[in-house]
A protein has these predicted regions:
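Intrinsic low-complexity, disordered N-terminal segments enriched in polar/charged/small residues
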Residues: 7-9, 29
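N-terminal amphipathic/hydrophobic targeting modules at extreme N-termini
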Residues: 16-19, 35-36, 41-42, 54
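Hydrophobic alpha-helical signal peptides and transmembrane signal-/tail-anchor segments
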Residues: 27-31, 38, 43-46
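Short, Lys/Arg-enriched N-terminal segments with co-localized hydrophobic residues
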Residues: 55-74
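Class II aminoacyl-tRNA synthetase catalytic cores and aaRS-like
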Residues: 71-370
Length: 370
């Protein structure tokens, strides 16, 4: 658009552009207009008048300004998360759905074909769901279903003591959403993969679908969730600190150094400096974020990159207050894991430590013991 146009011609040009865009799109787009048009008061007021009407609805705006044309559509409004027609595992376990026809989606974890009857095990985010295929009843051909395919299954929920979680779905239909291009390179349906670390990493998107492999991420989630929930309950404020800096927060030479637009920079070892700064603002702060340490090592107890759970608190009487807060976190989180992550604990075969009473020993006493 030529901004040298006089005000009246410019307004006509803008009106024409708005009409064209209203006829083809669901909203108003002024991206193509140069900033120079704001120098013309009439054009600016017209744009302002148009923009002020957008929240009130597309139709009112069109009528007021005489905008019309074929192909116009009413502006659609997004009102939030839609209720899904498909059920999750937690929904299937409810008493009221037993005997009801339901829809579930998921990935085919494995198929056990017994002839006239087959068990199609679906893998969902909450765990495994057993589906029962009956030849001549289920309404589809089992040969069309492949392991690792994603499907939408329809069937009747029934109790079954031998099925995972005590329920199964007696299939009435199945819609294939996607199919694998080739057989899976790893036996992900096995309890343990029993393959090399190299193979697991080479096929990481596949190996992580194994129940034991993915359970570790759920435990990690529980630890971080417990940290956040507990500290929120204790009046802490969550902060987010920079990870690229000019200097380290803790000092030392073990830093990952990088070029930051031709200036030297480092990856932060710790948010300590920022935590101390924000204690003066909120009294109690915490952060869950990655930290980086350029330390060569040959043990499993050292990591160059990990997720650090940091908190800082003011107005304390001594370090014992910090120890008490840490103990409170451990107690809260271990109970959370036992309650909300029991399946993952069982799959991994781990035992949650008891945290009711944690011994507190002085450093000089520890040195004598070792």
């Amino acid at each position: 658009m030529d901004i040298a146009l006089d005000e009246s011609k410019l307004k006509v040009q803008i009106e024409f552009s708005v009409r064209v865009q209203c006829g083809w799109y669901r909203g108003f787009y002024f991206d193509n207009f140069r900033p120079g048009i704001l120098k013309y008061p009439g054009a600016f007021l017209f744009l302002r008048d148009i923009a002020s009407e957008i929240p009130q609805g597309y139709t009112r705006c069109r009528k007021k300004h005489g905008i019309s044309g074929k192909g116009e559509r009413k502006m659609e409004l997004v009102k939030g998360v839609k209720k899904s027609e498909t059920l999750e595992l937690a929904d299937l376990l409810k008493e009221e759905v037993k005997g009801q026809t339901v829809k579930v989606n998921g990935a085919v974890h494995t198929i056990r074909d017994m002839g006239t009857v087959a068990f199609v095990i679906l893998r969902k985010r909450g765990g495994l769901v057993q589906c029962v295929y009956e030849k001549g009843v289920s309404g589809f051909d089992l040969k069309d279903v492949k392991e690792a395919a994603t499907v939408e299954a329809t069937g009747v929920v029934a109790e079954s003591e031998k099925a995972p979680h005590g329920i199964e779905i007696r299939l009435r239909g199945m819609r294939i959403l996607s199919e694998p291009a080739a057989p899976m390179p790893l036996p992900i349906a096995k309890w343990k993969l029993n393959t090399s670390l190299e193979a697991k990493l080479n096929y990481r998107p596949i190996s992580l679908r194994n129940l034991r492999e993915r359970a570790r991420f759920r435990i990690q989630e529980g630890l971080v969730r417990g940290f956040r929930d507990f500290l929120y309950g204790e009046g802490f404020t969550e902060i987010h600190t920079p990870k690229i800096g000019a200097k380290s927060a803790e000092g030392g030479a073990n830093l990952f150094r990088l070029d930051y637009f031709h200036r030297p920079a480092i990856l932060q070892q710790s948010p300590q400096f920022y935590k101390q700064m924000m204690v003066g603002v909120f009294d109690r702060v915490f952060e869950t974020a990655p930290v980086f340490r350029a330390e060569k090592h040959n043990t499993k107890r050292h990591l160059n990159e990990y997720t650090s759970l940091d908190f800082e608190m003011g107005y304390i009487d001594g370090f014992e207050d910090v120890m008490a807060m840490e103990t409170g976190y451990l107690q809260y989180t271990m109970k959370l894991l036992e309650k909300e992550y029991a399946d993952e604990i069982r799959i991994l075969g781990i035992e949650i430590p008891k945290t009711e009473d944690i011994p507190a020993v002085r450093f000089d006493e520890i040195k004598k013991l070792v």
